[in-house]
Amino acid sequence: QWLTAQEVTANMLSAEDGVCMLPVPAATALLMKDPGVRQALDLSAEWDAVSSTPLPMGCIVARREFVEEHPEAVDAFLDLYGDSISFMSDEGNRSEAAELVAKYGITANAQIAEAAIPQCNLTLLTGEEMQDTVQAYYEVLYRAAIGGSIPYDSLYYLP
């Protein structure tokens, strides 16, 4: 049964025992709310133990027509996105970054954001590095989970 992060958190907070999988920052919020909950494993660390590429946990999606008609806008967006990742990842910016995360509703408050940011593994991979990383991830998934086959190279933005 699929549940939202909020539903999983509510279930864990109301149960005496249980196991769940939550993304950061939802996991961070749960750990802060209930001292009886513990992190049993770190998926990124587990992945790193068996793979030469990082674990991809998110992506940027755009319509092909937009990318083809506005490549300069896509490149500018990726540059700004990279700047944002650098800002968020700089320990000296942690408090300000946490305030922004809370302000824009990504977390319930800045305290959760400040604790979660170091665990987020924020990165931006582009070009062939991104393609190699995602391809390695697809190789370990059940084919049915990704539509029966690994996507074509045309799926990737390779400027």
Residue positions per predicted region:
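Generic secondary-structure boundary/loop-capping signal
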Residues: 52, 57, 64, 114, ...
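Pocket-lining segment of extracytoplasmic ligand-binding domains
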Residues: 7-100
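Short secondary-structure capping/turn micro-motifs that flank functional sites
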Residues: 28-29, 117, 157-158
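Conserved C-terminal helix/tail region of periplasmic/extracytoplasmic solute-binding proteins
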Residues: 135-159
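Short, solvent-exposed coil/turn linker segments
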Residues: 39-42, 126, 151
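Secondary-structure end/capping motifs
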Residues: 67-143
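Short beta-strand-to-loop elements that line the ligand-binding cleft
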Residues: 1-5
